[in-house]
């Protein structure tokens, strides 16, 4: 048993050492997922998530928010087609149109391998290629995101690219950009060419 000089000292030790152990992280992750499943955690949606949910509602696509997949939760699980939509905050998930690799914060740098691991896990164990709707696109061009979501759903998850920032509207039609940009979590990996 550990003895501490003060409450603050104990909290600092806990944050710096105890909570960084792999065993603790795995146990805590499972506890959080269970709490989500049992409805014990409040689900406060961000503005981009509300927009994504509105798109799915307008398209009459059934979905579940915050659906657990063992170690991860996904933003929108389209259960009738076994598909996933992830709502990607520009800051937290490092939108490459906004952030360069040289100017990332420590928080952003730590987020990239987590996004990479989640992407690989869902592809490997569930065979799902996620559609990534980025915050900027949801807020500035919701119609593009709606067309992309519709195409993703009705083509059973088959798209030429899975990131909303790689599309534009041309005469009201969804069009893939000539220059494809990869999110940070797919750069320098074998899946970049296949999954980007």
For each feature predicted by the language model, list its residue ranges:
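Cys/His-enriched microdomains
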Residues: 3
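Nucleic-acid endo/exonuclease domains
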Residues: 6-196
